[in-house]
Amino acid sequence: MDNMNSFVEYSICNRPATGAYSVPKSGYHSHHHLHHHHHPLDQNQGFPVTTGSFHTGLAASPAAVNGSRTDSSAPGAVYNPDGRLYGTAGEEGAHGATGTSQHHHQHPHHFPEQQPEQNGYSHPHLQTQTLQSGTLSHYNHGSSGSAYAGQSCARNSEYASTNTIHSHYYMEEPAASTYYHQSSFTSTAPTVGPSYGALAGAYCGPQGALAGSQYPQQLVGGLDAAGYLGLPQGGYGEPQTTQERERGGEEGQQAGQGQTFDWMKVKRNPPKTVKVSDFGLAGAHNSAIRTNFSTRQLTELEKEFHFSKYLTRARRVEIAATLELNETQVKIWFQNRRMKQKKREREGGCATPRTPSSSGFNKELEDTDHSSTSTSPGASPSSETSSERAA
């Protein structure tokens, strides 16, 4: 069986001018040599297999035709001056040259062991690997390490593809085990930008996860952005904190109200109740109850009224102490007596003679009590008593 090798040509994924994988160039012919139970290379994946002249890199010799040549001068993959990467593909189209002397004549079930030694071309029929992680695996962990160092967090436009790619994407083991699936994403960068932004964020560790969580609609797996970031469901973290603070403040107020201080006791003491004896009342003090004066009390009050219709406070206190009354009772009696006297004078029931002294005294009363007439201070008690009875 012919073991003629072919060259797989594809450009570096982070070139801004090209897509993720280049289309077949004109002038090259696809040439496959299939082994008995090996899987053929799928042309729909956009990986051209070209034959023709052998391409050499900057420091590498031509690759062997039968895959048996040993080239120790090339430390890793072969690059040409314009920056494109060339790798040899054998019967399976899945094994690249890494600078070691190997026969690339392996069966498909040995493919997982050869993954760290590949230049990034993954088998199209193995869904356990990714087109992206297979490309990044060698350059992040291999011997060369200069072309793809730090390219795991590339920009969204660097992953734009000119072909329609159907594949399954998995995150690498160090990142997480969340399953990402992008089905039938197409050419332009603005269309696939958000989805690749979420995917690239997954490769960047915790910082990338924060960036990837901005596009939760692109994550088809079971990853919840809010739960992954440690936030409570529904985003009600801050309102719950506010409610807890308010609840704590209310509890503090209740605890403060439970304590009774000395200044609070003073305010809470009830006011002193007025004694009934202060008003001379037998019942409730707020109800208008008529005071029953004795004959002796009435005689002494009438004598004082004849001498002076208006009492000073000192005289009122003295009379109240003598008659066993309070000041309020004496004051109210004198007010009622003056009103009665005015009523008599208005009706003309009093015709007593007036003296000059009484007239001068009446002028003083007019200024204070607005009364025009008054009984003379020299009137006999008998006549005053008779006038009260007539009234």
UniProtKB/Swiss-Prot annotation:
A Pfam family that the UniProt record links to this protein: Homeodomain
Keyword Nuclease assigned: no
DNA-binding region: 286-345
Annotated region described as Disordered, given as residue ranges: 62-125, 231-260, 337-391
Principal location listed in the UniProt entry: nucleus
Superkingdom of this protein's organism: Eukaryota
Composition skew (Low complexity), residue ranges: 87-100, 371-385
CDD domains named in the record: homeodomain (cd00086)
InterPro entries per record: HD (IPR001356), HD_metazoa (IPR020479), Homeobox_CS (IPR017970), Homeodomain-like_sf (IPR009057), HXA1/B1/D1 (IPR046327)
A single GO molecular function term of this UniProt record: RNA polymerase II cis-regulatory region sequence-specific DNA binding
Example of a GO cellular component annotation carried by this entry: nucleus
Motif (Antp-type hexapeptide): 260-265
Subcellular location: Nucleus
Keywords carried by this UniProt record: Developmental protein, DNA-binding, Homeobox, Nucleus, Transcription, Transcription regulation
Task performed by this protein: Sequence-specific transcription factor which is part of a developmental regulatory system that provides cells with specific positional identities on the anterior-posterior axis.
Family the entry assigns: Belongs to the Antp homeobox family. Labial subfamily.
Protein name (database record): Homeobox protein Hox-B1a
Organism: Takifugu rubripes
Phylogenetic placement of the source organism: Eukaryota, Metazoa, Chordata, Craniata, Vertebrata
Gene encoding the protein: hoxb1a
